[in-house]
Amino acid sequence: MRTLVVLLIGAVLLCSANAFLDELLAESVNDMTDKRACFDKYKSNICGGVISPAHCVRRSGRMAKFAKENCAHFCGFC
């Protein structure tokens, strides 16, 4: 009887540990995708050339909107 109780407790603990590991792995995958999301599409020719840091802090305007959407790394939004 004791052996059965010990085995059941061990099975429950093992299942909870596996669920915890699955949650950790899911969180690490989410973190990795967030890091990849921030990049400059036009780094070599527009961000830093045509777009200036002043465009990053403006509230409105075509250039400000473009800078916030496409030059996130240049503007320091990452």
Curated annotation (Swiss-Prot):
Residues 1-19 form the signal peptide. It comes from Nematostella vectensis (Starlet sea anemone). One of its GO terms (biological process) is neuropeptide signaling pathway. Expressed in ganglion neurons residing in the mesoglea (observed in both planulae and primary polyps). Not expressed in nematocytes. Keywords: Cleavage on pair of basic residues, Disulfide bond, Neuropeptide, Signal. Probable neuropeptide. Residues 20-36 form a propeptide. Disulfide bonds join C38-C78, C47-C71, C56-C75. It comes from the Eukaryota. Residues 38-78 form the ShKT domain. This is Protein Class8-like.
